């Protein structure tokens, strides 16, 4: 039996397949997941599991270099936005119109993880990165400019 971390087999498998720049969407209970998306449905009941728990567990296992959320999040759900900035402090943050998060980003995502969250604008995209110190830390390796501050 696995000792810790994410125990859900489907989610664990999806995380293991993600590569640099791949997008993972972690969404609330009401998100309209596209029919052809790789849907990982964790929702059991209202706020079970909640968005922050799922994002936190994923963050413990995944290198995240970018976070995208609806442009409404900073003004309409500032507590969530603040939490995201704390939890993903090394990531670049961007916003998109809410309709794009529901449409274009959902189609772009390698997987969509549905939580039980009843969280306004609780649909968060995570762009995968690389562990820069481990990736570029070898002797004689020239570190690309965009990773220099992370090595």
From Swiss-Prot:
Gene Ontology CC terms, in alphabetical order: cytosol
Residues reported to bind substrate: 28, 98, 121-123
GO molecular function terms noted in the UniProt entry: D-ribose pyranase activity; intramolecular lyase activity; monosaccharide binding
Catalytic activity: beta-D-ribopyranose = beta-D-ribofuranose
Recorded superkingdom: Bacteria
Assigned EC number: 5.4.99.62
Pathway membership: Carbohydrate metabolism; D-ribose degradation; D-ribose 5-phosphate from beta-D-ribopyranose: step 1/2
Gene3D superfamilies assigned to the protein according to its UniProt record, in alphabetical order: RbsD-like domain
Keyword list, A-Z: Carbohydrate metabolism, Cytoplasm, Isomerase
GO BP: any one term: D-ribose catabolic process
Places the protein is found: Cytoplasm
Active site location: 20
Xref: InterPro entries: D-ribose_pyranase (IPR023064), RbsD-like_sf (IPR023750), RbsD_FucU (IPR007721)
NCBIfam families (UniProt xref): PRK11797.1
Subunit: Homodecamer.
PANTHER family, sorted: D-RIBOSE PYRANASE (PTHR37831:SF1)
Protein family: Belongs to the RbsD / FucU family. RbsD subfamily.
HAMAP family named in the record: D_rib_pyranase (MF_01661)
Function: Catalyzes the interconversion of beta-pyran and beta-furan forms of D-ribose.
Protein name: D-ribose pyranase 1
Organism listed in the record: Streptomyces griseus subsp. griseus (strain JCM 4626 / CBS 651.72 / NBRC 13350 / KCC S-0626 / ISP 5235)
Gene behind this protein: rbsD1
